[in-house]
Each structure stands twice: as structure tokens, then as C-alpha cells.
Amino acid sequence: MVSFSLLRTTRPLQRCGQLVCMAARAQHSKVAQTQAGEAAGGWTGQESLSDSDPEMWELLQREKDRQCRGLELIASENFCSRAALEALGSCLNNKYSEGYPGKRYYGGAEVVDEIELLCQRRALEAFDLDPAQWGVNVQPYSGSPANLAAYTALLQPHDRIMGLDLPDGGHLTHGYMSDVKRISATSIFFESMPYKLNPQTGLIDYDQLALTARLFRPRLIIAGTSAYARLIDYARMREVCDEVRAHLLADMAHISGLVAAKVIPSPFKYADVVTTTTHKTLRGARSGLIFYRKGVRTVDPKTGKEIPYTFEDRINFAVFPSLQGGPHNHAIAAVAVALKQACTPMFREYSLQVLRNAQAMADALLKRGYSLVSGGTDTHLVLVDLRPKGLDGARAERVLELVSITANKNTCPGDRSAITPGGLRLGAPALTSRQFREDDFRRVVDFIDEGVNIGLEVKRKTAKLQDFKSFLLKDPETSQRLANLRQQVEQFARGFPMPGFDER
């Protein structure tokens, strides 16, 4: 297995080789384009983006530069491999293929049938699932459509569901609604009741969840989070589901890469259905997956007849034709590439490093006096509660953005405002993909702390959030401090390699 340190040493040499090859290909391609254009006397579709649309090309270059010179700490983001990006930008974008392998509504689907079947096989292999007991639909466009398709398959309109409350670390699609409005489509089409964290421990309150479930009698309980740094007790949630006769759906969108690498517990032993995105810790293209149990569910004690699971047909029908049309074949191929990568020893080492880096970041924050929801982390992220510091996540996010550190404001338990929530969510996956190690994350915390201190000083001088943002740009002393910190951050960040394409 190649070590991270060796990769760090050899990557610049690899990049040089890639640039030489790219230059040769570009020269050959340009000649071919010119010849083809002259022969056809018009549009050939072979024009490069830089030639065809310089304005868009420049925007892409600016975004690539932003990613290279900045520190990406948004927990739901990662850097996709060049191999997966090549599949994503391939001729598969051209093919329409409504339906499923062997049952398409369009001709010419023999190759995309093979691609979809390969993606299904790799998805099951990545999570060590027996094809006789589990199936997977790889067509959902992303995580939210995957969840809605699963709900559509498992529930009737206005059936009851329970999910972790959004301010406590849940996700919009788990049924969130405010005091005055149903926000998520899940809460519009189904009746939702949240479960919450224990305010003293910052952990999911499983006892209260069980009590609420006995009263609410949900048809579905969702085990999944978007800003919760601890492991989920799937066994306990299975007990609750069995007691109230509810399905258990595990949404592992944030942690699926860690599950595939076997560095945290898997939900598959306990869940009926498992959904996930593919671009977070799994480090693939943006898409969604729905896993479902199949085979024998139980045996009728009176007749001895086997009773099968019925999820497969219901989920497939919910995805197509109920909610989607033609699948995105280019995305399915790119996901298949990422799933193959997820089965390698290198990916397991990456996932272990994600956990080590998140822990190092949490420890460094605690040593600097920051408060973390639940007191730490077991996963890829930490949720910082800035309220004891006297700052909010919106102000911290803006300061960090101005110094090329990308994080996101996030609600903490007890928050009443999504505009100025008390939390800041920080994730390790993206920078770990750039080969950051523990000491590098401790340095990142130094930068964050300096940014927070700037934010605290400016907050004392301003009232409203808009005044705060304006002061950051207009006050000469503050602007200079931000510029100095930004220079340090960018100089540090540029010392690490970037996955994907080298456009420049």
C-alpha cells in the first residue's frame, strides 16, 4: 500500500508528466479540430470550452483557483478523482435510457445497461452486501431525490415519519418544518415528528425517541444526520422500530465512505433501507443510491410459508417512473469509478486519516477553549458552538470566507435562527483528499482561531449582521488584518496537491 507521505513526494512528478501528456494531446486535438472544421465548413462540436465560451472557461478557472488556494472545510464537500471526472464528462451524457437494464424505453442502451449493472455490482461489493439479500437502485440524481423516492416506496401519503430535528443535526429531507411552515417536501407530503438531542450531553436522546415513537406511532424512522459528530446506535433504533412496527431507513449520506472503508459501524445489519449520496466521504460524483433488503423477510408460523421483502419493485417504481425520467448515465459511470476506488486499501487508509484529522481538529479546538456539540467527534466532522465565545456562525463563516477558508454556519441545539445560528460545521474529508495530516489540521485551527478573534473584535463595533459584513470590507485596519491572514492561508494551502484536472 502506498503511504500518504510517498504520495506527497511523488505527486509533483506525476503532475509534470500529466502536463506534458496533456500538452501533446491538446496540440493533436487542435490540429484535428481545425481540419474537421475546415472540412465541414461549420460547427463540429469539437471546439474546446476555452475557444467556444471564453467567459465560462474563465469562470471555471477562477473556481479551480479558489479551490486550490483555499482551505475547504465544508463537511459535505470533497474532491473527486480525475478518473471519475472523466467518466462524468464523457459521451454518456448524450444517451437517454428511461427504464432499467433489459427493460428500456429507448434503443441503443446495450452499453449503458452494462454500465448500470456494473455500478450496482460495485455498490453491493463496496459495502460487503450479499446480492441475494440486498439490492440497490443507482439512478437517483442525488441524496434528496433518493430519500423522497424511498419515502414514496415505503409510505402512503400522510403516513407518519420521525427524523432527527434539523437544529439538532438532522437534514431537511428528514421531515423538517418550522413552527409556522412545512419546509421540506417530506413534511408536506407526510406527517413528521422530530426526535432530538439530549441538551446536556449533545447526544441523540434514544429514551425520549422511544417514548415519542410509542405515542406518535410512525410508519418510518430515519437514522441519519448532517451535522452530528457522533455514531448512531442503529441497534437501539432497530429495537424502537420493531416495537412500534416501523421501517428503519438509514441515511448514511455523510458517512458512506467511512462505512465502506469499515472504519465506523455499518447500518446494514439493522436497516430495512439505506440511502446515501456519493460525493461526500465516498468521494465520487454527485448522485444518490438506495439500498433495500430482498429475499425472505420472515416465515409464517402457521403455514410455514416464506414471506419475502417487497421493497425492490416499490423502490424501483418510485424512482422511475414516479419521480424521475431518464437516468444520468454519465453520473452512474462516475459513481461506479468511485465505488471501485472505495474497495481499495488506499481508500481505507484515506478514511482512517479522515477520522484522525477530524479528531486532531477537535482536540486543537478544545485546547483553544472552543465548545463542541457533544464534546468531540467520532466521525469526519466537528460542530463548534460559538455562542459561549460571543459569536455566531454567520459572522464566523463570513470572516473565514474572506481569508480563503470555506466552512458553513450551522444550527446548534436550542438555536432559534437559521440566519445567525450559533454553530460552525467543520469537516475533514476534502483536505484529507489533499493529503493533509494531523499537524496540518492543527495549523488550520490556528488560522480559524485568528479569524474568529477578528470576528469578535468587529462584532463589538457593529450591531446588525449587514453592518458587520460591511465593516470587514471598509475598515482599513481590519481589511489589512484579513489580507495578511488570507496570504498566510493561501500560501499554506498551495503547498498541497489537488485531485482532479490540472487545467492551467
Swiss-Prot record:
Name this polypeptide is given: Serine hydroxymethyltransferase, mitochondrial
Post-translational modification summary for this protein: Succinylation at Lys-280 inhibits the hydroxymethyltransferase activity. Desuccinylation by SIRT5 restores the activity, leading to promote cell proliferation.
The reaction(s) this protein catalyses: (6R)-5,10-methylene-5,6,7,8-tetrahydrofolate + glycine + H2O = (6S)-5,6,7,8-tetrahydrofolate + L-serine
Primary role: Catalyzes the cleavage of serine to glycine accompanied with the production of 5,10-methylenetetrahydrofolate, an essential intermediate for purine biosynthesis. Serine provides the major source of folate one-carbon in cells by catalyzing the transfer of one carbon from serine to tetrahydrofolate. Contributes to the de novo mitochondrial thymidylate biosynthesis pathway via its role in glycine and tetrahydrofolate metabolism: thymidylate biosynthesis is required to prevent uracil accumulation in mtDNA.
PANTHER family: SERINE HYDROXYMETHYLTRANSFERASE, SERINE HYDROXYMETHYLTRANSFERASE, MITOCHONDRIAL
The encoding gene: Shmt2
Any one of the GO CC terms: mitochondrion
GO biological process, one term: one-carbon metabolic process
Cofactors, names only: pyridoxal 5'-phosphate
Family of this protein: Belongs to the SHMT family.
